[in-house]
A protein has these predicted regions:
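Conserved alpha-helix/loop element of class I SAM-dependent methyltransferases that forms part
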Residues: 85-106
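Conserved SAM-binding motif I beta-strand of class I
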Residues: 131-136
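S-adenosyl-L-methionine
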Residues: 138-184
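C-terminal catalytic and target-recognition region of SAM-dependent MTase-like enzymes
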Residues: 217-273
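Non-catalytic substrate-recognition/targeting regions of SAM-dependent transferases
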Residues: 2-19, 23-85, 92
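S-adenosylmethionine
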Residues: 166-242
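Conserved SAM-binding loop of SAM-dependent methyltransferases across substrates and taxa
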Residues: 118-130
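Conserved class I S-adenosyl-L-methionine
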Residues: 106-117
Length: 273
């Protein structure tokens, strides 16, 4: 991914490049010394520290290319810029999974993309020919995803954009008897407000409902998480338990230019062959 690069990590921080912009932001897992010297870290275009952008907050949005998509980046809350680089490697797999499912089914697969954020996974599926339902509880995030669809030339693809709590949406789909061929979800550790999402207590019931709307067995499932204790092995076990399909899992890891490796969570997927 030429426009996405982890330059270095250490001291609880990560130095990344998104296109032409270098970003310095926290990485709690990077509890080691940086691999590069201070000069490499000296002049980032954006820097997040002490819960705010301390450098570059007024920067205009810019675009990058990743996975055949054009995506808009900009300074956002929580030190985010709109793209999770560690997910980019999964988009190619999603494209193949959609194509394989379409060939097997004889029609475009119906894909549900939950916690869809700014749309990377959603657009990877749509680009490959899927009919996609994109769900996120954040109205600004969904608007951002729609903007990315426009930038990527996918605005006219069959994508439904839903601003709603993922749990509520899936429960309603289950009551209605709707079915999906592919499931993609990247749940956060926790949400905010009354009845907010907590992955420790809410993921298993959500997977149970998802299994019911993708039965008897989905064409493919991709589950990822950034929560401590939810590594690839555990996520793979969850997919096997709830969907009854073979699943493999591994850690979400970025390798830095400096040679260091930064763990960022886990993923599990199956059964696309």
């Amino acid at each position: 991914m030429a426009d996405l690069e982890l330059i270095d990590c250490g001291g609880g921080r990560r130095l990344e490049r998104f296109g032409a912009v270098v970003v310095d932001r926290p990485a709690p897992a990077a509890d080691w010394l940086p691999g590069l010297g201070p000069s490499a870290w000296a002049k980032p275009g954006l820097e997040w520290a002490r819960s705010t952008w301390v450098r570059g907050a007024a920067r205009d949005p810019w675009t990058i290319r990743a996975g055949g998509l054009t995506l808009e980046c900009r300074p956002a809350a929580g030190g985010q810029v709109g793209v999770f680089p560690e997910h980019a490697a999964t988009w190619e797999w999603l494209g193949r999974a959609v194509a394989g499912s379409a060939e097997r089914l004889g029609r475009p697969p119906e894909v549900l993309s939950l916690f869809g954020y700014t749309g990377g996974a959603t657009l990877a599926c749509a680009k490959a020919g899927a009919r996609v339902v994109h769900v996120d509880s954040s109205k600004p995030a969904v608007a951002w995803a729609r903007r990315n669809a426009e930038l990527s030339g996918l605005a006219e693809r069959p994508i439904r954009w839903i601003v709603e709590d993922a749990r509520a949406f899936v429960r309603r789909e289950r009551r209605r008897g709707n079915r999906y061929d592919g499931i993609v979800l990247d749940p956060p550790s926790y949400g905010h407000g009354t009845g907010a999402w907590h992955i420790e207590t809410d993921l298993a019931p959500l997977l149970e409902d998802l299994a019911a709307i993708s039965g008897p067995k989905p064409s493919f499932v991709l589950l990822s998480a950034h929560t401590k204790g939810f590594g690839g092995e555990y996520l793979g076990a969850l997919v096997r338990e709830h969907f009854g399909i073979a699943a493999t899992g591994d850690d979400l890891v970025l390798r830095a230019r400096s040679g260091l490796r930064l763990p960022l969570g886990g993923w599990a997927r199956g059964p696309y062959h």
